[in-house]
């Protein structure tokens, strides 16, 4: 049994977070386990200053955040494909804002630029300022 004062607690807290992270098969389907894994890894790093697995926990936290960025990007792709540009932009922006170091952030920024260019080219021409008068 692992108690608050157990010598195994450090290892147990790390392994619980890693098990949750490794259990995620597809980042785009369910973010709940990714959010829980991230939280557990952050708690481990915050409370285990002398933890034996700190470096592995940092690496796992980066992996977790990469998967969360991937999730936001893929959800944005879904919305873009079905023509819901507002939803696409929302999820691309979440990837960019929440996970700036992730590789999917670059792709999300590229998609935001593409959608911005597309929306500019789709805007209707402005009406004439003054209508011609009839003779």
Region locations from a protein language model:
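Acidic, polar-rich low-complexity tracts and alpha-helical solenoid repeat scaffolds
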Residues: 1-135
């Amino acid at each position: 049994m692992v108690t608050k004062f157990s010598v195994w607690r450090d290892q147990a807290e790390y392994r619980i977070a890693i098990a949750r992270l490794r259990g995620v098969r597809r980042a785009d389907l369910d973010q709940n386990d990714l959010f829980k894994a991230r939280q557990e890894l952050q708690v481990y790093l915050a409370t285990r200053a002398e933890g034996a697995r700190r470096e592995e926990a940092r690496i796992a936290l980066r992996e977790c955040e990469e998967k969360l960025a991937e999730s936001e990007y893929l959800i944005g792709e879904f919305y873009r494909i079905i023509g819901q540009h507002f939803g696409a932009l929302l999820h691309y922006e979440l990837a960019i804002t929440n996970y700036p170091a992730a590789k999917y952030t670059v792709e999300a920024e590229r998609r935001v630029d593409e959608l911005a260019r597309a929306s500019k080219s789709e805007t209707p021409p402005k009406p004439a300022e003054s209508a011609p008068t009839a003779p």
